[in-house]
Design a protein with these regions (language model features):
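ATP-binding N-terminal substructure of ATP-dependent carboxylate-amine bond-forming enzymes
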Residues: 1-98, 116-119
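A conserved helix-loop-beta module that forms one wall/lid of the active-site cleft
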Residues: 75-78, 82-150
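A short beta-strand motif that forms the metal-chelation/ATP-contact edge
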Residues: 255-260
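CheY-like receiver
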Residues: 49-50, 99, 123-124, 159-163, ...
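Short catalytic-loop micro-motif centered on adjacent basic/acidic residues
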Residues: 56-59, 82, 108-111, 170-172
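Short glycine-rich anion-binding loops that position phosphate/pyrophosphate groups of nucleotides
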Residues: 62-64, 137-139, 186
Length: 260
């Protein structure tokens, strides 16, 4: 997503990823007489080597090494955008939801899960109601790391816990949405934000299949404006510059989009 605009603007990029045939590396050549670094984007040594070559270090996805990015920034090796604090927040979906909730951003009902026991899950299900979605706090992406719980039977609870593995979890109340909506928001270092028009995202098997623009919401006038306003407000509370994808559910009344 960075390489095409960078090529059009004549901005040289160094891309850190494992292998020489990753999509970004195939799309944009490294600056003259150099090559893209080869290695995992969670590796401290590779990140530090990349930082020495760059004026600004940014990320395409949040599943990176935030600790190293903080060190790179504090040591002055290069500028890091968005702020490592923002990346760390986005990495933990529960902390992200709590952060937005505390700042008045509408989110789905949620509860943290401490001990992953049958009794603990039952209490949370009683509070949020069934069905309830059990979610991994970290390394979750595009439906991965989610397990819907339809009942509080021992077998169903254990099946969900086994599926989600050893990662920390939280629970989210069920949202009977009618559309999934996304807004791209641009934020600069001074905190100014601008957004693009909202789009509808259609998923199948937890994978985005179709993205429709402009957003079509028959009988729900003003949804685009409300979605953009909500997305800009959410991103306005973050730190650092970047382009952020804000996903939300559109509820049946058309009046209450909530951040995912």
């Amino acid at each position: 997503m960075l390489t095409h605009p960078a090529a059009l603007l004549g901005i040289p990029l160094y891309i850190l990823d494992s292998g020489s045939h990753t999509p970004a590396k195939q799309t944009l050549l490294a600056p003259a007489n150099t090559s893209h670094p080869d290695g995992p984007f969670t590796s401290e040594s590779h990140i530090r080597e990349l930082a020495k070559q760059c004026d600004i270090l940014t990320v395409e996805i949040e599943h990176v090494n935030a600790d190293v990015l903080e060190s790179v920034e504090s040591e002055g090796l290069c500028e890091v955008q968005p702020s490592p604090a923002t990346i760390r927040l986005i990495q933990d979906k529960y902390l992200q939801k709590k952060f937005l909730d505390e700042r008045g951003i509408p989110v789905a009902p949620y509860e943290g899960i401490g001990e992953k026991t049958e009794d603990g899950i039952k209490k949370i299900a009683e509070k949020l109601g069934l069905p309830v979605m059990l979610k991994a706090r970290t390394l979750a992406y595009d439906g991965r790391g989610n397990s819907p719980l339809q009942s509080t039977s021992s077998s169903d609870i254990q099946k969900s816990l086994d599926f989600l593995g050893d990662r920390p979890l939280y629970a989210e109340g069920w949202c009977p949405f009618v559309k999934e909506v996304a807004v791209m928001v641009v934020r600069n270092k001074e905190g100014e934000v601008r957004s693009y028009d909202a789009v509808e995202t259609v998923h199948k098997d937890s994978i985005l299949r179709v993205c429709t623009a402009p957003l079509r919401a028959k009988g729900m006038e003003g949804v685009n404006e409300r979605a953009r306003e909500l997305a800009e407000k959410a991103v306005g509370h973050l730190q650092g510059a970047g382009i952020f994808g804000v996903e939300m559910f559109l509820m049946a009344d058309g009046e209450s989009p909530c951040i995912l």
